[in-house]
């Protein structure tokens, strides 16, 4: 395919095709597994600051030469060590917020405060044992290093006749996981991510003066950096958007009311009735897609995938073109196929992750739901 589209974009496109084709969106929360899987007996964790204590943390800036005739007015890149104390606190708070471990203890004072030079130093097994014993925990997650790269730019936005001042900071935290019984770290993580700020002004100087100050930027970047490794360490809830067909027949409209009341079983009965009660392929496709969403909400991901595949096959017949056989096919040619295929791809990804997620959540004895509607979940598009 020459182009790819998001589920939301395809939905907006479909809405423009006709008012009779009613779509509503719902927000859902679903659990995604972490990259790491911890043994179920590890219930208590300490988050520690294992970085050098560097008192001088000035930004080291390099300014680029700007070519004439471009919208870019200025651009400079700066490098700095991030604030490890703030990042360690943020890391501990974010892990505690996920409610995965029974207890999260923080030790944000630098373990290597006496270091003369910035360096990474892996904790020895004896140090890990002593820390775990003194803090009363089963294992250690340590922030080992934090580097920041900040890019500041001012450019003219011709379409808005104004200037934009932007700061884009890329954070590079290094995190190690230590178990007392191991002589070496269980793993080392080197994630990275970006945080962005922007301001606007009538002149380049005005836009530049409104930009976030360095001190605030460094603090907020350190807080953000602490959250970056968390998805690699513990399962996390992710927000998603799903779309339901709500028009075309009385059962479909009534089912939409049940969804707003969170009565999914009643909605399913009407969607199934709509699917079985018609030979119209478009109506069957819409009902099938809704039933797929129903099964996803019930955590029956295999059934959800089965119904999404039915919807996809019907969409292929409706659009009268096999998208996989033509590199020239676009959303204009196969809008229904795009919508069903994008949703099916999301379900396949969730299904592939499910065994790992179940393994990671097996430490909890109670019955868990991996999918749930977000508060105020139904919103008409």
Predicted regions and their residues:
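N-terminal intrinsically disordered, low-complexity regulatory tails that precede a folded domain
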Residues: 21-30, 34-46, 52, 58-67, ...
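N-terminal segment of the mature soluble domain
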Residues: 51-142, 182-187, 320-323, 328-364
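Conserved small/polar residues in nucleotide/adenosyl-binding loops
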Residues: 370-375
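C-terminal/domain-edge helix-coil "capping" segments
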Residues: 20-42, 178-287, 291, 297-369
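A short, hydrophobic beta-strand-centered structural micro-motif
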Residues: 42-51, 122-159, 173-175
């Amino acid at each position: 395919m020459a182009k790819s589209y998001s589920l939301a974009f395809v939905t907006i496109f479909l809405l423009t095709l006709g008012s009779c084709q009613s779509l509503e969106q719902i927000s859902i929360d679903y659990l995604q597994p972490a990259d790491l899987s911890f043994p179920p007996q590890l219930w208590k964790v300490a988050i520690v600051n294992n970085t050098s204590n560097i008192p001088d943390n000035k930004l080291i800036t390099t300014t680029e030469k700007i070519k004439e005739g471009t919208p870019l007015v200025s651009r400079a890149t700066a490098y700095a060590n991030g604030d490890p104390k703030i990042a360690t606190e943020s890391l501990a708070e974010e892990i505690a917020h996920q409610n995965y471990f029974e207890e999260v203890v923080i030790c944000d004072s630098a373990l290597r405060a006496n270091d003369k030079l910035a360096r990474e130093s892996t904790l020895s097994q004896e140090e890990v044992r002593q820390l775990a014993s003194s803090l009363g925990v089963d294992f250690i997650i340590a922030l080992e290093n934090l580097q920041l790269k900040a890019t500041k730019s001012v450019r003219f936005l011709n379409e808005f006749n104004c200037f934009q001042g932007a700061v884009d900071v890329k954070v590079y935290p290094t995190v190690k996981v230590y178990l007392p019984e191991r002589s070496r770290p269980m793993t080392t993580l080197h994630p990275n991510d970006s945080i962005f700020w922007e301001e606007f002004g009538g002149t380049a100087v005005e836009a530049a003066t409104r930009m976030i100050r360095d001190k605030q930027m460094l603090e907020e970047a350190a807080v953000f950096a602490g959250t970056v490794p968390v998805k690699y360490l513990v399962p996390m809830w992710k927000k998603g958007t799903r779309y339901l067909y709500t028009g075309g027949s009385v059962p479909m409209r009534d089912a939409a009311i049940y969804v707003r009341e969170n009565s999914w079983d009643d909605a399913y009965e009407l969607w199934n009735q709509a699917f079985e009660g018609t030979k119209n392929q478009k109506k069957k496709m819409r009902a099938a897609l809704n039933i797929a969403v129903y099964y996803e909400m019930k955590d029956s991901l295999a059934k959800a995938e089965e119904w999404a595949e039915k919807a996809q096959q019907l969409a292929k017949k409706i659009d009268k073109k096999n998208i996989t056989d033509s590199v020239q096919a676009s959303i204009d040619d196969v809008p229904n196929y795009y919508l069903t295929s994008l949703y099916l791809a999301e379900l396949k990804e969730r299904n592939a992750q499910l065994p790992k997620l179940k393994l990671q959540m097996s430490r909890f004895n109670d019955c868990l739901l991996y999918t749930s509607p977000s508060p105020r979940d139904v919103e008409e598009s």
